[in-house]
Amino acid sequence: IKTALPGLDIIAEDLGFMTPEVIALREYSGFPGMKVLQFAFDSREPSDYLPHRYPTNCICYTGTHDNATLAQWLGDAKGDDVAYAKQYLGLNDEEGYVNGIIRGGMSSVADLFVAQMQDWLALGGETRMNVPGVLGHGNWCWRMLPGALTDELADHIAAMTAMYSR
């Protein structure tokens, strides 16, 4: 692939069940893998999605187009999972839980960090991009409203970007 398409940036979608062969192929390719913060806080088992376990050669996401927004996840997740996220990331009401999760991704060692605009705006499930396996239902229709990106939010994003050298 690298020979046929030089200069093309490729991300290995290494989500879900990972066999040793798939892990070896990703490592051999050198392509960065995906780390989704929402997957980190399943309180039932240890997780490679926790930021302290990230390799640098990865991309950290708050969620993907197929995930709930962070605000929806916080409302829908099991209490133990949210409690684990609160403890691990030091989430508090003053900063806001959604903002604290974004901070957790921004401060990770991942080479890249991606947050959905819905998460920066702390929007709920009505702004979810896609519900897998469901046709219609507003999938792929969300658009940011004019004026939603305020100067205050832009300054906040810029400050976090500078603070964490992103």
What are these regions (language model features)?
Residues I1-R166:
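Catalytic cores of glycan-processing enzymes that make or break glycosidic bonds
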